[in-house]
From Swiss-Prot:
Keyword Transmembrane helix: yes
Keyword Zinc carried by entry: no
Transmembrane segments: 53-73, 86-106, 113-133, 143-163, 173-193, 211-231, 262-280, 296-316, 338-358, 366-386, 400-420, 433-453
Similarity comment text for this entry: Belongs to the major facilitator superfamily. Nitrate/nitrite porter (TC 2.A.1.8) family.
Protein name (Swiss-Prot/TrEMBL): Nitrate transporter 2.1
Entry superkingdom: Eukaryota
Membrane topology: Multi-pass membrane protein
Disulfide bonds listed in the record: none
Endpoints of the signal sequence: none
Length: 547
């Protein structure tokens, strides 16, 4: 017997209607913000945005603070060039596994606890920098401080949770870009802190040690603010509360989530190419001050101030990368996002080569470094205009894997060209290292041509006929999980993701089509004595159905 259609998600519709009164921006069907007003601190969307980038900013400051004071630390601990280079490799190696693990953590307990725990657990390592006595302790402490770079995953996951798919590239890029500024800010801030302590009467060999109490203390402060002010979900509640209430469906067993993320080849390609945008940025953050100090005979304060320019360009460069991604997606869809990434990152590789070729001129070096930083950092932002669409169910795992690719690229590149330990590195200058790093960047960006989404296509080929967003995202769920209603977030995301077809795509979006997994889930539900509508109505967000 047919029933009168009943509107599902009534509370969500009511919330969306009230959004203009409650928030200074509109919300989408998932409660995510359709706009990112960075000057506001509105709960929960904008407060999460600001807490995420501030925590990430501090992780960069602490990780690269030793590189900012490298000439001073090198002389005090009697470190060789190769030892200093290996310590730099250790700093970025720490976060490789940590970023993948953090992806699992945020998928399970939410970004707020993940961010706060990261800051509190690595703060002791920052303080311990004051106690190092030789290369082994110095490298060990840098390794453990570098673990905090997994904050990147919390930052991107949190923003991806709070902002609509049409602006998620911009929001992710702004937050990550402002966080990345810490890599430049530390080159400016740490020499000033060191000099201020030294001018206060503290000997130089002690002053650099005292300087590390500043970022260590700020670690604890930011973790406390995150716990007190942060909120995990657009609903205004934390993950654990939503799971207790049943409002936020569990993602099922952990292994299927990990399998979805690691088993998607697109994740690995983006991890590889991110290693030569963000990885290149990390490498430059590690070596630029020492390069300017030694190559041009500058004092530490001047070398630090000039080196800081590269990282401080993140104030707008990474954000513009995300904006470019969202802008080209409007007419060209996902294919436009991938093309833009390939073009920008290739240009970054070209200017990296040029940077190594102008090593005899300080003015030319600074100008080319600025241009190089623009393309390199825009490419970072462009990556996370694509990453959220690889997997809805395993978004945290994919973000962690791609982020880990950045650290892996930095570790490999620095070990090959800048560590000073291999035989060929004995006669290799840092300028030559920049040239070869640029060549690697150009070559290892080419795999982007192999990324293909069945519903959107690739850089050179179109979509598969009849492919729909619902099919792609629903394949991550089994029939039993669908019958349990665990897939609902993926279905809503699939509907929002139709915007990635681009306005030039002539396919009509039309009504939501029931994917194969959903039909199987309905049969499973019916076989267990339930009603088909318990799957269809809740999943499609449409009106009710009949028996």
């Amino acid at each position: 017997m047919a029933e009168k259609p009943a509107t599902v998600n009534a509370e969500l519709v009511k919330e969306m209607d009230a959004a203009p009164k409650k928030y200074p921006y509109s919300l989408d069907s998932e409660g995510k913000a359709n706009y990112c007003p960075v000057w506001r601190f509105t709960q929960p969307h904008m407060m999460a945005f600001h807490l995420s980038w501030i925590c990430f900013f501090m992780s960069f400051v602490a990780t690269f603070a030793p590189a900012s004071l490298a000439p001073i630390i090198r002389d005090d601990l009697f470190l060789t060039k190769s030892q200093l280079g290996n310590a730099g490799v250790a700093a970025v190696c720490g976060a490789i596994a940590a970023r993948i693990f953090m992806g699992i953590v945020v998928d399970s307990i939410g970004p707020r606890y993940g961010a706060a725990a990261t800051m509190l657990m690595t703060a002791p390592a920052v303080f311990c920098m004051a106690l190092v006595t030789d290369f082994s302790t110095f490298a060990c402490v840098r390794f453990f401080i570098g673990l905090s770079l997994c904050m990147f995953v919390c930052c991107q996951f949190w923003c991806g949770t709070m902002f609509n798919v049409k602006i998620v590239g911009t929001a992710n890029a702004i937050a990550a870009g402002w966080g990345n500024m810490g890599g430049g800010a530390c080159h400016f801030i740490m020499p000033l802190i060191y000099q201020g302590i030294k001018d206060g009467g503290v000997p130089g060999y002690q002053a650099w040690r005292w300087a590390f109490f500043v970022p260590g203390g700020i670690y604890i402060l930011t973790a406390t603010l995150t716990l007190l002010l942060g909120i995990d979900h657009p609903s205004g509640k934390d993950y654990r509360d939503l799971k207790k209430e049943g409002t936020l469906k569990a993602k099922g067993a952990m292994w299927p989530v990990v399998k979805c993320g690691l088993g998607n080849y697109r994740s690995w390609i983006l991890a590889l190419t991110y290693g030569y945008s963000f990885g290149v940025e990390l490498t430059v953050d590690n070596v630029i001050v020492e390069y300017l100090f030694d190559q041009f005979g500058l004092n530490l304060a001047v070398a630090g101030a000039l080196g800081a320019i590269f990282g401080l360009m993140n104030l707008f460069t990474r954000a513009t990368g995300g904006m470019i991604s969202d802008l080209v997606a409007k007419p060209f869809g996902m294919r436009g996002r991938i093309w833009a990434l390939w073009i920008i990152q290739t240009l970054g590789g070209i200017f990296c080569i040029v940077l190594g070729k102008v090593s005899n001129s300080l003015s030319s070096t600074i100008v080319i470094m600025i241009v190089f930083s623009i393309f390199c950092q825009q490419a970072c932002g462009l990556h996370f205009g694509i990453t959220p669409f690889v997997s809805r169910r395993a978004y945290g795992v994919v973000s962690g894997l791609v982020g880990a690719g950045g650290n892996t690229g930095a570790a490999i590149t620095q070990a090959i060209w800048f560590a000073g330990t291999a035989p060929w590195q004995l006669t290799l200058s840092k300028a030559d290292g920049f040239v070869y790093m640029g060549i690697m960047t150009i070559g290892l960006t080419l795999p982007l041509f192999f990324i293909w989404f069945p519903m959107w296509g690739s850089m050179l080929t179109g979509p598969r006929e009849g492919a729909e967003e619902e099919d792609y995202y629903m394949r991550e769920w089994s029939a039993e999980e669908v019958a349990s209603g665990l897939h609902q977030g993926s279905m809503r995301f699939a509907m929002e993701s139709k915007s990635q077809r681009g306005t030039r795509d002539k396919r009509a979006a039309g009504p939501a089509r029931v994917p194969q997994q959903l039909r199987l889930g309905a049969r499973c539900c019916q076989a267990r004595g339930g009603l088909i509508r318990c799957v269809l109505a809740q999943s499609l967000g449409a009106t009710g159905c009949s028996d």
